[in-house]
């Protein structure tokens, strides 16, 4: 999973902007665009993003790493 792209997808699905996310985590808007380009993120940063977007990125990453056997 490209976590940066996934963050961007979730943000867009929620109808929110990069500027909004920047104000919430907080950082500069240009940094948010850099986040979108990253394949991995620092755990603390991903935690802040998860909280403000109310989305469990950690669960999705875990499910990708350890898929359930059917």
Regions found by a protein language model. Give the residues of each.
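Recognition helix of helix-turn-helix/homeodomain-like DNA-binding domains
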Residues: 26-41
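A short, Lys/Arg-rich alpha-helix, primarily the initiator
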Residues: 1-20
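Alpha-helical residues within the helix-turn-helix
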Residues: 12, 23, 51
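Short, charged recognition helix plus adjacent turn
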Residues: 9, 14-15, 34, 59-70
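DNA major-groove recognition helix of helix-turn-helix/homeodomain DNA-binding modules
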Residues: 44-60
């Amino acid at each position: 999973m490209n976590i940066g792209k996934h963050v961007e997808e979730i943000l867009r699905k929620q109808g929110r902007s990069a500027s909004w996310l920047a104000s919430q985590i907080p950082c500069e808007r240009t940094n948010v665009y850099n986040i979108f380009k990253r394949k991995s993120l620092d755990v603390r940063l991903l935690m802040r993003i998860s909280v403000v977007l109310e989305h469990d990125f950690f669960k999705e990453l875990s499910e990708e790493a350890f898929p359930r056997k059917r």
